[in-house]
C-alpha cells in the first residue's frame, strides 16, 4: 500500500506560536505556570507540557493571585481578561493573531451598536471568546451553525448588521452560509477577507486535491480539534473511509484491508513527530511506501507575545 502525505499538514503559525510561548515562559518564569484551557487541541502536546510542569485550568478563578498565566491560542472573552487583571496575573497572551483579528471586528460592531452574527460551533472555546467580545446593550450577538439556524433568526435592524466566523470551519460549508446571509440581509457587513484562516484553507485544499488518488484517509489530530474533524469530513463526504487518530496505538490494521493508497494529513494542532509515529505504525501493520503529495508551501510566522519577547530579549517591545 502506498501512503500519500498531504502538504501542508500539521502545525500552523498560530499553534507554533502558542506552543513556543508556553515553552519559553517555562524558561523565563518560576513554576508553576498556569494555562487557561488546553493551549491547543492536541492531547499529545498537552500531555507533554504537563510533564514539563504546566498546570492547565478551565478558568482564571483557579489561578492564584499574582501567578503566571497564559491564554490559549483560541482566545478569551473580555470578562476573562478582566478577571485576570483583577487577580494581578503575569499574563502572556498566546491567542492566535487571526483570532484576534476576528475579535477586533466583533468589538467594532459592538461599539457601533450593530447586531452581530457569528458562524461557529456552540461550546468551542474560540467561539466563547469571540462571543464575549460583544458588549453593546442596544444590539446583540447571535451564533449560528447552519442555514437552518439562519432561517430561524430574527434581526432587529438589518441595516446595521455584521458577521464573523470561527477560524477553523469548513471553507465550503461556511461559504454557503455566508452567501445565504448576504441573500437574506443585503446590507450586512463583514470582514474584508474571510475569517477562515489560511492554514485551515490550505489543509482542506490539500485534502481535496488528494481525494481522487486515495481510498482511505488517516487524519492525525485529537477528537476535540475542530479543524482536524473538518479534514476527516472532506473524505467521508466523498464516500472515502476516514479516521481521526492522535495515538499510534489507535491505528487498526483492518482499516487498510483491500486499500491501495492511504492519504495521511494532520490538523493544525498536530506535531510532525506524531505524524511520523503514526506513519511508522501504519507501516508495521501493512507493507507501505511513502510519498509526499505536492502542495502549498507555508512560510507564515507570528512573533511571540510582546511581554515574552521583552523577557527573553529577542525583540523590541512595540
Swiss-Prot record:
Gene3D superfamilies: 3.40.50.11270, 4-hydroxy-3-methylbut-2-enyl diphosphate reductase, catalytic domain. It catalyses: isopentenyl diphosphate + 2 oxidized [2Fe-2S]-[ferredoxin] + H2O = (2E)-4-hydroxy-3-methylbut-2-enyl diphosphate + 2 reduced [2Fe-2S]-[ferredoxin] + 2 H(+); dimethylallyl diphosphate + 2 oxidized [2Fe-2S]-[ferredoxin] + H2O = (2E)-4-hydroxy-3-methylbut-2-enyl diphosphate + 2 reduced [2Fe-2S]-[ferredoxin] + 2 H(+). CDD domains: lytB_ispH (cd13944). GO terms for biological process: dimethylallyl diphosphate biosynthetic process; isopentenyl diphosphate biosynthetic process, methylerythritol 4-phosphate pathway; terpenoid biosynthetic process. (2E)-4-hydroxy-3-methylbut-2-enyl diphosphate binds at residues 41, 74, 124, 167, 225-227, 269. Pfam families: LYTB. Binds 1 [4Fe-4S] cluster per subunit. It comes from the Bacteria. The active site is at residue 126. GO terms for molecular function: 4 iron, 4 sulfur cluster binding; 4-hydroxy-3-methylbut-2-enyl diphosphate reductase activity; metal ion binding. It is an enzyme of class 1 (oxidoreductase). Pathway: Isoprenoid biosynthesis; dimethylallyl diphosphate biosynthesis; dimethylallyl diphosphate from (2E)-4-hydroxy-3-methylbutenyl diphosphate: step 1/1; Isoprenoid biosynthesis; isopentenyl diphosphate biosynthesis via DXP pathway; isopentenyl diphosphate from 1-deoxy-D-xylulose 5-phosphate: step 6/6. Isopentenyl diphosphate binds at residues 41, 74, 124, 225-227, 269. Dimethylallyl diphosphate binds at residues 41, 74, 124, 225-227, 269. Its EC number is 1.17.7.4. Keywords: 4Fe-4S, Iron, Iron-sulfur, Isoprene biosynthesis, Metal-binding, Oxidoreductase. InterPro entries: LytB/IspH (IPR003451). [4Fe-4S] cluster binds at residues 12, 96, 197. Catalyzes the conversion of 1-hydroxy-2-methyl-2-(E)-butenyl 4-diphosphate (HMBPP) into a mixture of isopentenyl diphosphate (IPP) and dimethylallyl diphosphate (DMAPP). Acts in the terminal step of the DOXP/MEP pathway for isoprenoid precursor biosynthesis. HAMAP family: IspH (MF_00191). Belongs to the IspH family. This is 4-hydroxy-3-methylbut-2-enyl diphosphate reductase. It comes from Francisella tularensis subsp. tularensis (strain SCHU S4 / Schu 4). The lineage of its organism: Bacteria, Pseudomonadati, Pseudomonadota, Gammaproteobacteria, Thiotrichales.
Amino acid at each position: 500500500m502506498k501512503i500519500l502525505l498531504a502538504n501542508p499538514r500539521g502545525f500552523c503559525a498560530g499553534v507554533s506560536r502558542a506552543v513556543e510561548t508556553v515553552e519559553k515562559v517555562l524558561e523565563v518564569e518560576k513554576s508553576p505556570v498556569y494555562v487557561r484551557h488546553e493551549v491547543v487541541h492536541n492531547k499529545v502536546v498537552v500531555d507533554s507540557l504537563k510533564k514539563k510542569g504546566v498546570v492547565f485550568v478551565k478558568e482564571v478563578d483557579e489561578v492564584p493571585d499574582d501567578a503566571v498565566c497564559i491564554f490559549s491560542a483560541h482566545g478569551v472573552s473580555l470578562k476573562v481578561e478582566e478577571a485576570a487583571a483583577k487577580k494581578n496575573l503575569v499574563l502572556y497572551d498566546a491567542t492566535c493573531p487571526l483570532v484576534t483579528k476576528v475579535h477586533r471586528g466583533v468589538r467594532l460592531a459592538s461599539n457601533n451598536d450593530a447586531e452581530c452574527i457569528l458562524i461557529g460551533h456552540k461550546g468551542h472555546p474560540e467561539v466563547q471568546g469571540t462571543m464575549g467580545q460583544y458588549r453593546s446593550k442596544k444590539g446583540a450577538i447571535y451564533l449560528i451553525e447552519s442555514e437552518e439556524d439562519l432561517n430561524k433568526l430574527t434581526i432587529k435592524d438589518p441595516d446595521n448588521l455584521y458577521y464573523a466566523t470561527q477560524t477553523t470551519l469548513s471553507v465550503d460549508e461556511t461559504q454557503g452560509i455566508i452567501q445565504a446571509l448576504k441573500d437574506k440581509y443585503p446590507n450586512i457587513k463583514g470582514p474584508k477577507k474571510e475569517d477562515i484562516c489560511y492554514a485551515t484553507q490550505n489543509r482542506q485544499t490539500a485534502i481535496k486535491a488528494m481525494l481522487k488518488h486515495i481510498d482511505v484517509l488517516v487524519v492525525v489530530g485529537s477528537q476535540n480539534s475542530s479543524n482536524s474533524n473538518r479534514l476527516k469530513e472532506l473524505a467521508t463526504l466523498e464516500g472515502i473511509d476516514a479516521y481521526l487518530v492522535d495515538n499510534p496505538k489507535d491505528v487498526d490494521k483492518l482499516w487498510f484491508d483491500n486499500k491501495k493508497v492511504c492519504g495521511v494529513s494532520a490538523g493544525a494542532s498536530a506535531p510532525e513527530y506524531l505524524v511520523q509515529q503514526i506513519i511508522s505504525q501504519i507501516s508495521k501493520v501493512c507493507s507501505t511506501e511513502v510519498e509526499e503529495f505536492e502542495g502549498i508551501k507555508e512560510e507564515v510566522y507570528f512573533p511571540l507575545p510582546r511581554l515574552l519577547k521583552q523577557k527573553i530579549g529577542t525583540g523590541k517591545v512595540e
